[in-house]
Every structure is written in C-alpha cells, then in structure tokens.
Amino acid sequence: MIRAKKSLGQNFLIDKNIIDKIINTVSITDNEILEVGPGTGNLTKEILRNNPSKMYLVEKDSFLAESLKEIIDERVKIFNEDILKFDEKSLSKNKIIVFGNLPYNISTEILSTWITNLKNDYWFSDLVLMFQKEVADRIIAKFNT
C-alpha cells in the first residue's frame, strides 16, 4: 500500500463516486488532458476510459511517476516535475482540460498563478480541481474576510 507523503501535500483520490462526479463534469473524448498530481492513478484510469486524444501527467513524486507507467498507454506522457515550475503552455497549441486533486500545500499558489495568467495566456479550456475544504472556503470567501 502506498502512503501519502504529507511533505508533498499528497491526498490520494480513492472514492469511486467522487471520481465519477469529476469525470462527468466535462467532455473528455478527443480532448487533451492535463492531470496535476495523479498520485496512484485512480482518476487517470477513469479519464483514459473516456478516450482523450492526449494526456499529460505532472507528478512531483518520482516513485509515483514511475508507478504510473504501469497504467498508461501511448496517449500519455508523464512529467516527473513540480507543477509550480512546469510550463503548461508548452504542451499543446490546443486548449487543454485540466484535472487535479491538487496537493494541499500548494493548491492556492497553483490556482492563483493560473488565474493571474488568464489575462495574458489562456491555455486551458476547463479547470476541474479538487481542494481541501479549508482552501475551497478561502476561495469562495468575500474579499477581506
């Protein structure tokens, strides 16, 4: 059994009902997908069953990045990198659907970076992200509260 590394803010997605809800939020078929922090690949497997044209996985944990090779096919490219240093815009000329069960310790920073860059370079079509409840509460809070 793989244990989540708290130092990397890992939290593995294992609930099939939640995975199904995530999958059903957007049309995956024939689209390019970026998954941030795929972890053990539970969401990855379901995305692949929905036939994306290409899929990019960014996983900082080298052990997990290596283990993901067992569940992928020719449509998938794995990047063993830190998403905060990763150049998402270099992946494709097409708009990409982003999925992420974001690492809790950097989720706010990732979202802030992507939203800040929206006005300059709109590289994704959809963001389907999971956050820790406390992070989600901060995101939807009124300004200056």
Locations of the language-model features?
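Catalytic cores of RNA-modifying enzymes
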Residues: M1-T145
